[in-house]
Protein backbone atom coordinates (compact mmCIF):
# COMPACT_ATOMS: atom_id res chain seq x y z
CA UNK A 1 0.00 0.00 0.00
CA UNK A 2 1.47 3.39 -0.94
CA UNK A 3 1.91 6.22 1.57
CA UNK A 4 -1.06 8.26 0.35
CA UNK A 5 -3.63 5.46 0.61
CA UNK A 6 -2.32 4.41 4.03
CA UNK A 7 -2.52 7.96 5.43
CA UNK A 8 -6.03 8.31 3.92
CA UNK A 9 -7.14 5.07 5.56
CA UNK A 10 -5.64 6.06 8.93
CA UNK A 11 -7.28 9.50 8.72
CA UNK A 12 -10.75 8.05 8.04
CA UNK A 13 -10.32 5.50 10.85
CA UNK A 14 -9.27 8.31 13.20
CA UNK A 15 -12.28 10.48 12.28
CA UNK A 16 -14.82 7.65 12.72
CA UNK A 17 -13.27 6.25 15.91
CA UNK A 18 -13.05 9.65 17.56
CA UNK A 19 -16.61 10.68 16.65
CA UNK A 20 -18.11 7.37 17.78
CA UNK A 21 -16.28 7.53 21.14
CA UNK A 22 -17.56 11.07 21.65
CA UNK A 23 -21.19 10.17 20.95
CA UNK A 24 -21.32 7.56 23.76
CA UNK A 25 -22.16 10.08 26.53
CA UNK A 26 -24.71 11.74 24.17
CA UNK A 27 -26.43 8.46 23.31
CA UNK A 28 -27.24 7.57 26.92
CA UNK A 29 -29.37 9.69 29.24
CA UNK A 30 -27.56 10.21 32.53
CA UNK A 31 -28.83 11.57 35.82
CA UNK A 32 -27.05 14.66 37.24
CA UNK A 33 -24.94 12.53 39.61
CA UNK A 34 -23.93 10.00 36.95
CA UNK A 35 -23.08 12.81 34.53
CA UNK A 36 -20.78 14.39 37.15
CA UNK A 37 -19.15 10.99 37.74
CA UNK A 38 -18.58 10.48 34.00
CA UNK A 39 -17.19 14.02 33.70
CA UNK A 40 -14.74 13.27 36.52
CA UNK A 41 -13.76 10.01 34.80
CA UNK A 42 -13.26 11.97 31.55
CA UNK A 43 -11.06 14.50 33.37
CA UNK A 44 -8.98 11.63 34.74
CA UNK A 45 -8.67 10.16 31.24
CA UNK A 46 -7.40 13.50 29.91
CA UNK A 47 -4.75 13.82 32.66
CA UNK A 48 -3.66 10.19 32.50
CA UNK A 49 -3.46 10.32 28.72
CA UNK A 50 -1.22 13.40 28.69
CA UNK A 51 1.13 11.97 31.32
CA UNK A 52 1.14 8.24 30.49
CA UNK A 53 0.68 8.16 26.71
CA UNK A 54 1.52 11.36 24.85
CA UNK A 55 4.67 12.49 26.71
CA UNK A 56 6.32 9.02 26.64
CA UNK A 57 5.38 8.61 22.94
CA UNK A 58 6.86 12.01 22.08
CA UNK A 59 10.07 11.29 24.01
CA UNK A 60 10.28 7.86 22.37
CA UNK A 61 9.88 9.39 18.90
CA UNK A 62 12.64 11.92 19.63
CA UNK A 63 15.10 9.33 20.95
CA UNK A 64 14.18 6.69 18.37
CA UNK A 65 16.82 7.84 15.89
CA UNK A 66 19.62 7.36 18.43
CA UNK A 67 18.28 3.97 19.51
CA UNK A 68 18.02 2.96 15.85
CA UNK A 69 21.61 4.14 15.31
CA UNK A 70 22.76 1.85 18.13
CA UNK A 71 20.73 -0.97 16.59
CA UNK A 72 22.17 -0.63 13.08
CA UNK A 73 25.79 -0.58 14.26
CA UNK A 74 25.26 -4.25 15.25
CA UNK A 75 23.38 -5.11 12.06
CA UNK A 76 25.90 -7.70 10.85
CA UNK A 77 26.20 -9.44 14.21
CA UNK A 78 22.73 -10.96 13.92
CA UNK A 79 19.92 -10.40 16.43
CA UNK A 80 20.55 -7.73 19.06
CA UNK A 81 19.16 -7.92 22.56
CA UNK A 82 17.02 -4.93 23.60
CA UNK A 83 19.27 -4.29 26.60
CA UNK A 84 22.32 -4.28 24.31
CA UNK A 85 20.62 -1.79 22.02
CA UNK A 86 19.87 0.44 25.00
CA UNK A 87 23.47 0.16 26.21
CA UNK A 88 24.53 0.98 22.68
CA UNK A 89 22.35 4.07 22.63
CA UNK A 90 23.88 5.21 25.90
CA UNK A 91 27.41 4.69 24.62
CA UNK A 92 26.46 6.50 21.41
CA UNK A 93 25.09 9.36 23.49
CA UNK A 94 28.02 9.62 25.88
CA UNK A 95 30.81 8.87 23.41
CA UNK A 96 32.44 11.92 21.81
CA UNK A 97 31.65 15.61 22.00
CA UNK A 98 29.25 15.64 19.05
CA UNK A 99 26.95 13.00 20.54
CA UNK A 100 27.10 14.68 23.95
CA UNK A 101 25.95 17.85 22.22
CA UNK A 102 23.07 16.08 20.44
CA UNK A 103 22.02 14.52 23.76
CA UNK A 104 21.85 17.99 25.34
CA UNK A 105 19.86 19.25 22.35
CA UNK A 106 17.33 16.44 22.68
CA UNK A 107 16.85 17.17 26.38
CA UNK A 108 16.26 20.84 25.62
CA UNK A 109 13.95 19.92 22.74
CA UNK A 110 11.67 17.86 25.01
CA UNK A 111 11.33 20.64 27.60
CA UNK A 112 10.90 23.42 25.05
CA UNK A 113 8.18 21.53 23.11
CA UNK A 114 6.17 20.81 26.28
CA UNK A 115 6.47 24.35 27.65
CA UNK A 116 5.62 25.95 24.30
CA UNK A 117 2.45 23.85 24.06
CA UNK A 118 1.43 24.82 27.60
CA UNK A 119 2.23 28.54 27.14
CA UNK A 120 0.49 28.60 23.75
CA UNK A 121 -2.74 27.36 25.35
CA UNK A 122 -2.30 29.80 28.24
CA UNK A 123 -2.13 32.71 25.77
CA UNK A 124 -5.08 31.40 23.73
CA UNK A 125 -7.04 31.09 26.99
CA UNK A 126 -6.21 34.65 28.07
CA UNK A 127 -7.06 36.16 24.68
CA UNK A 128 -10.30 34.15 24.49
CA UNK A 129 -11.43 35.00 28.01
CA UNK A 130 -10.63 38.72 27.64
CA UNK A 131 -13.03 38.91 24.66
CA UNK A 132 -15.77 37.10 26.56
CA UNK A 133 -15.36 39.09 29.79
CA UNK A 134 -16.01 42.36 28.01
CA UNK A 135 -19.50 41.26 26.95
CA UNK A 136 -21.00 39.23 29.81
CA UNK A 137 -21.18 39.06 33.58
CA UNK A 138 -18.09 37.43 35.19
CA UNK A 139 -19.62 34.08 36.22
CA UNK A 140 -21.23 33.19 32.88
CA UNK A 141 -18.13 34.57 31.13
CA UNK A 142 -15.93 32.17 33.10
CA UNK A 143 -18.10 29.18 32.17
CA UNK A 144 -18.39 30.22 28.50
CA UNK A 145 -14.66 30.83 28.13
CA UNK A 146 -14.02 27.51 29.85
CA UNK A 147 -16.14 25.66 27.25
CA UNK A 148 -14.45 27.52 24.40
CA UNK A 149 -10.94 26.96 25.78
CA UNK A 150 -11.51 23.27 26.43
CA UNK A 151 -12.73 22.66 22.87
CA UNK A 152 -10.11 24.96 21.35
CA UNK A 153 -7.33 23.38 23.40
CA UNK A 154 -8.29 19.88 22.34
CA UNK A 155 -8.67 20.97 18.69
CA UNK A 156 -5.18 22.54 18.76
CA UNK A 157 -3.92 19.36 20.37
CA UNK A 158 -5.65 17.20 17.74
CA UNK A 159 -4.19 19.39 14.99
CA UNK A 160 -0.69 18.84 16.41
CA UNK A 161 -1.48 15.10 16.45
CA UNK A 162 -2.43 15.35 12.79
CA UNK A 163 0.88 17.05 11.98
CA UNK A 164 2.67 14.27 13.87
CA UNK A 165 0.84 11.58 11.87
CA UNK A 166 1.44 13.42 8.57
CA UNK A 167 5.14 13.75 9.39
CA UNK A 168 5.28 10.07 10.37
CA UNK A 169 3.57 9.06 7.10
CA UNK A 170 6.11 11.07 5.13
CA UNK A 171 8.96 8.96 6.57
CA UNK A 172 7.60 5.97 4.57
CA UNK A 173 8.13 3.69 7.57
CA UNK A 174 4.93 1.73 8.17
CA UNK A 175 5.95 0.81 11.72
CA UNK A 176 6.36 4.49 12.68
CA UNK A 177 3.00 5.36 11.10
CA UNK A 178 1.22 2.58 12.99
CA UNK A 179 2.86 3.43 16.33
CA UNK A 180 1.89 7.10 16.00
CA UNK A 181 -1.63 6.13 14.87
CA UNK A 182 -2.16 3.74 17.80
CA UNK A 183 -0.80 6.34 20.22
CA UNK A 184 -3.12 9.02 18.82
CA UNK A 185 -6.18 6.73 18.88
CA UNK A 186 -5.39 5.66 22.46
CA UNK A 187 -5.82 9.22 23.60
CA UNK A 188 -8.23 10.66 21.02
CA UNK A 189 -11.06 8.29 22.00
CA UNK A 190 -10.83 9.09 25.76
CA UNK A 191 -10.33 12.79 24.93
CA UNK A 192 -13.50 12.86 22.78
CA UNK A 193 -15.39 11.13 25.60
CA UNK A 194 -13.92 13.56 28.15
CA UNK A 195 -14.70 16.62 26.01
CA UNK A 196 -18.34 15.66 25.41
CA UNK A 197 -19.00 14.75 29.06
CA UNK A 198 -17.39 18.04 30.16
CA UNK A 199 -19.51 20.08 27.71
CA UNK A 200 -22.67 18.25 28.86
CA UNK A 201 -21.74 19.00 32.47
CA UNK A 202 -21.22 22.66 31.49
CA UNK A 203 -24.79 22.73 30.12
CA UNK A 204 -24.28 23.05 26.38
CA UNK A 205 -27.20 21.89 24.19
CA UNK A 206 -26.64 18.61 22.36
CA UNK A 207 -26.55 20.01 18.82
CA UNK A 208 -23.75 22.40 19.76
CA UNK A 209 -21.89 19.59 21.53
CA UNK A 210 -22.07 17.55 18.30
CA UNK A 211 -20.59 20.50 16.37
CA UNK A 212 -17.76 20.82 18.92
CA UNK A 213 -17.14 17.07 18.65
CA UNK A 214 -17.12 17.14 14.84
CA UNK A 215 -14.56 19.98 14.79
CA UNK A 216 -12.41 18.03 17.26
CA UNK A 217 -12.76 14.77 15.27
CA UNK A 218 -11.91 16.50 11.96
CA UNK A 219 -8.84 18.42 13.19
CA UNK A 220 -6.32 15.55 13.25
CA UNK A 221 -7.28 13.81 9.95
CA UNK A 222 -7.40 17.11 8.01
CA UNK A 223 -4.03 18.29 9.37
CA UNK A 224 -2.50 14.84 8.77
CA UNK A 225 -3.52 14.97 5.09
CA UNK A 226 -2.41 18.61 4.67
CA UNK A 227 0.96 17.93 6.31
CA UNK A 228 1.52 14.85 4.17
CA UNK A 229 0.51 16.55 0.90
CA UNK A 230 2.31 19.81 1.74
CA UNK A 231 5.72 18.26 2.36
CA UNK A 232 8.15 18.22 -0.54
CA UNK A 233 10.95 15.64 -0.58
CA UNK A 234 13.55 18.11 0.72
CA UNK A 235 11.34 19.23 3.60
CA UNK A 236 10.60 15.58 4.43
CA UNK A 237 14.32 14.98 4.86
CA UNK A 238 14.66 18.12 6.98
CA UNK A 239 11.71 17.00 9.11
CA UNK A 240 13.21 13.61 9.82
CA UNK A 241 16.44 15.40 10.84
CA UNK A 242 14.72 17.54 13.49
CA UNK A 243 12.35 14.70 14.39
CA UNK A 244 9.11 16.60 13.78
CA UNK A 245 6.89 13.70 14.89
CA UNK A 246 8.27 13.75 18.44
CA UNK A 247 8.26 17.55 18.65
CA UNK A 248 4.64 17.77 17.44
CA UNK A 249 3.52 15.12 19.93
CA UNK A 250 5.27 16.86 22.84
CA UNK A 251 3.84 20.24 21.83
CA UNK A 252 0.37 18.69 21.78
CA UNK A 253 1.08 17.11 25.19
CA UNK A 254 1.70 20.61 26.54
CA UNK A 255 -1.66 21.83 25.21
CA UNK A 256 -3.34 18.69 26.56
CA UNK A 257 -1.85 19.18 30.04
CA UNK A 258 -3.11 22.76 30.13
CA UNK A 259 -6.65 21.78 29.16
CA UNK A 260 -6.76 18.82 31.57
CA UNK A 261 -5.25 20.52 34.63
CA UNK A 262 -6.18 24.21 34.33
CA UNK A 263 -9.68 23.83 32.87
CA UNK A 264 -11.36 20.50 33.20
CA UNK A 265 -10.12 19.49 36.67
CA UNK A 266 -10.97 22.77 38.49
CA UNK A 267 -14.35 22.87 36.73
CA UNK A 268 -15.16 19.32 37.81
CA UNK A 269 -13.86 19.94 41.34
CA UNK A 270 -16.46 22.65 41.89
CA UNK A 271 -14.93 25.73 40.33
CA UNK A 272 -11.43 25.28 41.74
CA UNK A 273 -10.74 28.51 43.64
CA UNK A 274 -14.27 29.19 44.87
CA UNK A 275 -14.61 26.17 47.17
CA UNK A 276 -11.75 27.33 49.42
CA UNK A 277 -13.61 30.54 50.21
CA UNK A 278 -17.05 29.01 50.68
CA UNK A 279 -15.89 26.62 53.43
CA UNK A 280 -17.50 23.24 54.17
CA UNK A 281 -18.58 20.93 51.40
CA UNK A 282 -21.71 22.61 50.09
CA UNK A 283 -21.60 20.60 46.89
CA UNK A 284 -18.01 21.70 46.24
CA UNK A 285 -15.03 19.39 45.90
CA UNK A 286 -15.17 15.72 45.01
CA UNK A 287 -16.94 12.90 46.84
CA UNK A 288 -15.04 9.66 47.59
CA UNK A 289 -16.67 7.90 44.63
CA UNK A 290 -15.67 10.78 42.34
CA UNK A 291 -12.07 10.66 43.60
CA UNK A 292 -12.02 6.92 42.80
CA UNK A 293 -13.43 7.69 39.31
CA UNK A 294 -10.75 10.37 38.80
CA UNK A 295 -7.92 8.03 39.83
CA UNK A 296 -9.41 5.26 37.66
CA UNK A 297 -9.56 7.66 34.72
CA UNK A 298 -5.88 8.52 35.23
CA UNK A 299 -4.90 4.84 35.39
CA UNK A 300 -6.85 3.57 32.33
CA UNK A 301 -4.50 5.21 29.74
CA UNK A 302 -1.53 3.88 31.73
CA UNK A 303 -2.87 0.31 31.52
CA UNK A 304 -3.64 0.72 27.80
CA UNK A 305 -0.18 2.12 27.07
CA UNK A 306 1.49 -0.73 28.97
CA UNK A 307 -0.56 -3.14 26.85
CA UNK A 308 0.62 -1.54 23.61
CA UNK A 309 4.27 -2.48 23.14
CA UNK A 310 6.41 -1.05 20.39
Swiss-Prot record:
Output the Gene Ontology cellular-component terms. Golgi apparatus; mitochondrion; nucleus; perinuclear region of cytoplasm; plasma membrane
What is expression of this protein induced or repressed by? Up-regulated in the ovary by reproductive hormones.
**Alphabetical GO biological process terms:** intracellular zinc ion homeostasis; zinc ion transmembrane transport
Q: Show the catalytic activity.
A: Zn(2+)(in) = Zn(2+)(out)
Cell compartment(s), UniProt:
Golgi apparatus, trans-Golgi network membrane; Cell membrane; Cytoplasm, Perinuclear region; Mitochondrion
Q: Which InterPro entries match?
A: ZIP, ZIP9
Q: Which UniProt keywords apply?
A: Cell membrane, Cytoplasm, Golgi apparatus, Ion transport, Membrane, Mitochondrion, Nucleus, Receptor, Transmembrane, Transmembrane helix, Transport, Zinc, Zinc transport
Q: In which tissues is it expressed?
A: Expressed in brain, liver, ovary, and testis.
Taxonomically, the superkingdom here is: Eukaryota
Per the UniProt record, one Pfam family is Zip
GO molecular function terms here? androgen binding; G protein-coupled receptor activity; zinc ion transmembrane transporter activity
Question: Transmembrane ranges?
Answer: 7-27, 35-55, 108-128, 148-168, 178-198, 212-232, 246-266, 289-309
Membrane topology listed for this record: Multi-pass membrane protein
Task: State the protein's purpose.
Answer: Has dual functions as a membrane-bound androgen receptor and as an androgen-dependent zinc transporter both of which are mediated through G protein activation and are required for the androgen-dependent apoptotic response. Upon androgen binding, mediates apoptosis by directly activating a stimulatory G protein that leads to increased cAMP levels and MAP kinase activity and which is accompanied by increased intracellular free zinc levels.
Q: Which PANTHER family match?
A: SOLUTE CARRIER FAMILY 39 ZINC TRANSPORTER , MEMBER 9-RELATED, ZINC TRANSPORTER ZIP9
Q: Which family does it belong to?
A: Belongs to the ZIP transporter (TC 2.A.5) family.
What is the protein name for this chain? Zinc transporter ZIP9
**Source organism of the structure:** Micropogonias undulatus
Amino acid sequence: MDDFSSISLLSVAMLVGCYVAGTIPLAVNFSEEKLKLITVLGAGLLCGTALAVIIPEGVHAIYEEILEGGHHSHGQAGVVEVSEAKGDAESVLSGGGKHEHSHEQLHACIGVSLVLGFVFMLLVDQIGSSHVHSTEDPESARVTSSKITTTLGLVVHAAADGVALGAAASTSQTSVQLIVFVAIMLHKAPAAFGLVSFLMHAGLERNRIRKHLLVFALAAPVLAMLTFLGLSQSSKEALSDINATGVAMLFSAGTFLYVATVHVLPEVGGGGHSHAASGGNGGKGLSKVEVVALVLGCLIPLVLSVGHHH
